[in-house]
Amino acid sequence: MSIMSYTGGTVLAMAGDGCVCIATDLRMGEQMTTIATDVKKIHKIGDRIYVGLCGFYSDALTVKNQILYRKSLYELRENRKMRPQVAAEMISNMLYNKRFGGYITEPLVAGLDPLTNKPYICAMDTIGCIASPRDFVAVGTGQEYFLGVCEGKLFYIILVRELPLELE
């Protein structure tokens, strides 16, 4: 059994035209054992930046506090709002610096660029390797299930959009 399954949880983010959606479950537990049903896994980092943290809950809270601390320092030094891409790079660097005794959490960043209003979503593994697809991303113990459902729905949406063009 993976270390990630001890407190479980899954976070999903989808990007649209000028919008992002981020969703999660509220349960914390291992397999059939439920510890809590009101656990917050999505945290607001900036005006338009959200971070979802799955995995070991105490590590997720530690990572969240470090993200908020580094975001405040960034905005003080740079005198501007943090962009989602910058937040993702910052989190990735933070996780990679602790790779040998790392945090047991998988972050997901979703947000809108404050200047261009373009959506940005990305997911990371426990050592900070960034995966930033255009349409959807998931992290956590239910990641495989969410990705399958999203791929099926996305294929259906693309098929419905393109099918009328082919019939004409």
Language model features by range: what are they?
Residues A110-G128:
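Acidic-glycine-rich active-site phosphate/pyrophosphate-binding loop
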Residues M1-Y103, G128-E168:
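Conserved short S/T/G-enriched processing/targeting/catalytic segments and their helical context
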Residues P107:
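Active-site rim beta-loop-alpha module in soluble metabolic enzymes
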